[in-house]
Amino acid sequence: MRYILTGAQGTGKSTLLHHFDDRMKVITEVVRNLAKTEGINVNESGDMHGQTRIFDTYYDILSNTKEQYISDRGLTDVISYTCCNMSRMHAQEEGQRFIEDQINRFIEFSEKNDDIVYFYIPIEFDVEDDGFRSTDEEFRKEVDKNIRDLFEYMEGIGSGLNVFTVTGTVEERLETIEEIMKNYGDIQ
């Protein structure tokens, strides 16, 4: 199985991810690396060019990495941030079309890749300012809502996504994730 931690910024995804460093392939910092190497705009400043690069990079990673891994972000996150920034993207109509195209692309991808498990990490504590991620709580809540709405939409169309909500302390979250991974036979 392939595992994706998904949720708004500052919910503890990277903290959870690093508990698996020595047990499986870890995919992290994709967006930060693109921002550093290509200068793309992210968070509230995200634009069509940057979101397109992020989508393409994640599709490349997901399509070409078939071995077991865990990632601290996924396409659900990219769709959510894109929805948040739609009003800032060129013309509203063009932004809406772009999002619809990306959701359809995600649906097609999901139908062909049923070996992905999503761990949804909701907002349970304040975001820490690390100098990169947005600390705007309203933006954060919007990102979180968009992810939940996307999962609800996917469920409504019968997508069959494997989604688990993971809450609690870091230890409780890890226990939940590890139990699910054990059920899939991926860790002992």
Regions found by a protein language model. Name each.
Residues 1-2:
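Pre-Walker A (Motif I) flank of P-loop NTPase domains
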Residues 5:
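Hydrophobic anchor at the beta1->P-loop junction of P-loop NTPases
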Residues 9:
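The conserved Walker
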Residues 13:
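Conserved lysine of the Walker
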Residues 18-60:
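Conserved substrate/cofactor phosphate-moiety recognition/catalytic segment
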Residues 49-113:
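Glycine-rich phosphate-binding loop used to anchor ATP phosphates in small-molecule kinases
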Residues 85-152, 159-168:
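A glycine- and Lys/Arg-enriched "phosphate-lid" helix/loop adjacent to the NTP-binding pocket
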